[in-house]
């Protein structure tokens, strides 16, 4: 692996601290009036998701983490996990639910997902930022609902995601959803 100096720290850089892969979320260079300059960074652990702050003296170096991303198509799921396929090599990768339970509600067959790999092992799966999903269940919008200030109602998508949608959305309609927040973005015209 390549070593990087504190002068090369930037947001988005993947580094290894104590044998664990981290993503730099924030980097502040501090030059006090007295003493040595240092970098105060906020990093997120790829394996646990925990965010911590670390301080490095100016000129120190750390190793970059062998974290890469690979685009793969979701094929199907079963009791054990989900199966993805590389569109170029047609290799299939089965990922157990314990690694991807947080995105289970966004799994839609024949959709491209980003698999995050560390030293060749899958450590996570990221869904597309926006997805178009069909509303499977929702209560009908009743005339006069807006008078009470209620403009959103609960709904369940065809993938099982529970979201809030405007009262004019009905079952069977396709909506665009932001998977980062789980929020409704817009109605998709057919």
From Swiss-Prot:
Name of protein: Elongation factor P 2
PROSITE patterns the UniProt entry points to: EFP
Involved pathway(s): Protein biosynthesis; polypeptide chain elongation
Subcellular location: Cytoplasm
GO biological process, one term: peptide biosynthetic process
Organism: Chlamydia caviae (strain ATCC VR-813 / DSM 19441 / 03DC25 / GPIC)
InterPro entries assigned to the protein according to its UniProt record, in alphabetical order: Elong-fact-P_C, NA-bd_OB-fold, Rib_uL2_dom2, Transl_elong_fac_P/YeiP, Transl_elong_KOW-like, Transl_elong_P/YeiP_cen, Transl_elong_P/YeiP_CS, Transl_elongation_fac_P
Keyword Zinc: no
Function noted in UniProt: Involved in peptide bond synthesis. Stimulates efficient translation and peptide-bond synthesis on native or reconstituted 70S ribosomes in vitro. Probably functions indirectly by altering the affinity of the ribosome for aminoacyl-tRNA, thus increasing their reactivity as acceptors for peptidyl transferase.
HAMAP family, per the entry: EF_P
Chief location category: cytoplasm
Record keywords: Cytoplasm, Elongation factor, Protein biosynthesis
Record keyword Iron present: no
Gene Ontology terms: cellular component: cytoplasm
GO function terms (MF aspect): translation elongation factor activity
UniProt family annotation: Belongs to the elongation factor P family.
